[in-house]
Amino acid sequence: MCGFSVFLNYEPYLRELFSAEKRGGDESRILKIDNLVFAFHRLSINGVDDGSQPFVKDGIVLVCNGEIYNYEHLYEKHDLPSSHTKSDCEVILALYRKYKSIDFINELDGVFAFALYDTHTKQLIYARDKYGVRPLYIGFDKSSSHMIVSSTLGAFPSSMKDISQMESSFVNLIDTVTCRSMANINWYRNNHPSLSVKDALIFSVKKRLMSERPIGCLLSGGLDSSLITSIVVREHLKNGGKASDIRTFSIGMKGATDLKYAKIAADFLGTTHTSWEYDIGTFIKNIPNVIRDIESYDITTVRASVGNWLVSRNIRETTDIKVVFNGDGADEVCSGYLYSKNAPSLEDLQKDQEHLLDNIQYFDVLRSDRSISSHGLEARTPFLDKDFVNAYTSVDISKRAPKCVPGASSEQEVDITKWYLRKQFEGYLPDEVLWRNKEAFSDGVSSCERPWHTILKDHYKKSYGKTEEEVYKEIFFSMYGDIPVIPFKWMPKWSDTDDPSARTLKCYT
């Protein structure tokens, strides 16, 4: 994982220059060119020997936080000159040098946020991947023509007020002389899916196995992380490895529902599994650290991030693993949230699925990326592969809607979300995991008797006389100022509840 900041017409302080360092700890570099300063902090994943950024060639400068999985194919397809480094990201520089345009972005298969400067045209170009897996913030000070593009909010001085997330799947061109936007374009072009849903997800995992560093999997025991782990194990076995080579990790409080199912999945798959159990106090006391690193005050995002943050910290401190697979994004792509059962119509379900994906950069994918990368690890998120998303969402919505669990009796809860996905992968997991009802990670880290959401609400009311949301905002504002980082409060739809926890829904069992 890497972090970068680009400063236009701004004399940066070292604190601001190096605030992105928490996203990458192998190397840091600063480059000043024309009226721009580039700061880059690198964690080597591919190209561990020589992948130093910023890349500079023929008056073109590039910084990129990302992984381009099809870089070898692009070098061959476009007859590009050989890479000067082993970094997959350098293909972006090579493509721009050849075509002097941004039309190539739709060909990039991966996750990325990058900034590219052309000294000949004086244009700064910055872009973000389809679903915003990699973070990118933009800040302007219009009165003085100052501008900052950065992986982290920590790069922005308190005097800069006009700060926002870069829209996912967009590319922007800035005239660095006038500090004006010349174009803001959605680069994504949808293609007809060439793979089945099953093959697309398997291929999504397979290409993300590209790494020169050890690989592990977050395994909560839910469908999503368990399915990704199963595919990782199967691909590793095909390559001559052993299931026990794959390390899996879970976390929770005493009695956490996830810990039980994570062990069932790990035993079935044969992975080397580690689980950590912490008391409530450990979860609560780390919330300020979590808010600092995820750069959000959204309630459900903070709740879910604590477990993610703790397990990532432990992986960093106790293993040599640098790349971590996760199951995030499946609920947005596959209408997996429990409230989906209450959708009034298939049309409403379809609109909600599109809405969730359009805004995932502010919520679930933010949680996963920030919690993991803040500990110097690389998050791999196969469910947000653009080809898999395209394949899955091309299936008729009637097939993707919640359906009856196979073999369920009339007395049982029969509707289950992600039914279509589960059917594609029968045999990949034990049935009690494959057909396990949705349990949000923010809920599964706790027991049913003492749910995480009630623990937090009671704690803040008793200790501070404030709501959970008020406390989170105060912590965030004290660190970053009053920046509107979320467009709305995440809440379940079609439900009679005032809390985002799925355990407050009538359909929760």
Indicate residue ranges for each PLM-predicted region.
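A short alpha-helix-loop-beta-strand transition element characteristic
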Residues: 431-437
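Short, well-structured alpha-helical segments
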Residues: 17, 89-93, 389, 422, ...
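Cysteine-centered catalytic environments shared across enzyme families
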Residues: 1-296, 318, 322
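ATP-dependent adenylate-handling active sites, centered on carboxylate activation for C-N bond formation
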Residues: 8-11, 120-125, 133-136, 140-141, ...
